[in-house]
């Protein structure tokens, strides 16, 4: 009788898996079609989470006029980005990858994780890029003093700690480091309402500050002084 019960449970589990189908945990499928039909050389790819994912929607001209590719996916942690790094970065053969990652690890989107492991995942992305001849621009996390989806957390100090690790690593490896945190910080580890409505994700004015900084980082990586398009708000 016991064997019959166990067998029934096993068959039920298999049936449930088949019914649900496979889960695209790393979301390989998000950019699969866009990657497949890409028919031009790629200069710069932006890898990231919701901050990168939303950037192209908030200011599409910055990406379209510069020919930049946005490969951000909302909610993703560093291990998910690392999993799809080959398909969404390496296989596209860009000259430069801009990496902005880590805030969703601090938010525990996939459960608790030590900052050292978050840092290690980001370093692994840098290693993979450089091994494949892709130059890296490494970005600090943006200031963030609260999560709208996890209001009980106070992330500002962890953000600073991870940024310290990233900045030190970038200096040691001679990788261009873009300090968004310094440019957007309201003095308390967050962002002002002018730059962010939820304390974590920038609005257009925040992205405009980021654009002027990141193009400098891209030029440092390429060893050029190229003039990139950046959006300018009309004078009031």
Where are the language model's segments positioned?
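Sec-dependent N-terminal signal peptides
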Residues: 4-13
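Serine-esterase "nucleophile elbow" of acetyl-processing enzymes
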Residues: 18-96
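Cell-envelope and extracellular/periplasmic
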Residues: 71-74, 101-102, 106, 110
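Glycine-rich anion/phosphate-binding loops
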Residues: 76-83, 112-121
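Conserved, well-ordered alpha-helix/loop/beta-strand core segments that scaffold catalytic motifs
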Residues: 98-102, 122-123, 130, 137-139
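Charged helix-capping and loop-helix junction motifs
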Residues: 114-123, 156-163
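Helix C-cap/helix->beta junction micro-motif
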Residues: 131-133, 172-173
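Catalytic His-Asp segment of secreted/periplasmic serine-dependent ester chemistry enzymes
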Residues: 142-236
């Amino acid at each position: 009788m016991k064997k019959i019960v166990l067998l029934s449970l096993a068959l039920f589990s298999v049936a449930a898996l088949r019914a649900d189908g496979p889960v695209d945990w790393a979301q390989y499928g998000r950019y699969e079609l866009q990657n497949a039909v890409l028919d031009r050389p790629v200069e710069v790819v932006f890898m990231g989470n919701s901050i990168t994912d939303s950037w192209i929607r908030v200011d599409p001209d910055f990406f379209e006029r510069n020919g930049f590719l946005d490969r951000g996916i909302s909610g993703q942690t560093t291990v998910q980005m690392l999993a799809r790094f080959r398909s969404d970065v390496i296989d596209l053969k860009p000259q430069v990858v801009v990496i902005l990652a880590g805030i969703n690890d601090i938010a525990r989107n996939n459960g608790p994780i030590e900052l050292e492991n978050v840092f290690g995942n980001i370093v692994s992305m840098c290693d993979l890029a450089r091994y494949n001849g892709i130059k890296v621009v490494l970005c600090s996390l943006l200031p963030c003093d609260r999560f709208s989806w996890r209001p009980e957390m106070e992330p500002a100090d962890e953000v600073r700690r991870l940024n310290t690790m990233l900045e030190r690593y970038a200096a040691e490896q001679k990788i261009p480091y873009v300090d968004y945190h310094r440019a957007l910080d309201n003095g308390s580890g967050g962002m002002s309402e002018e730059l962010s409505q939820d304390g974590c994700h920038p609005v257009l004015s925040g992205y405009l500050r980021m654009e002027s900084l990141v193009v400098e980082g891209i030029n440092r990586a390429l060893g050029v002084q190229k003039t990139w398009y950046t959006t300018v708000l009309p004078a009031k």
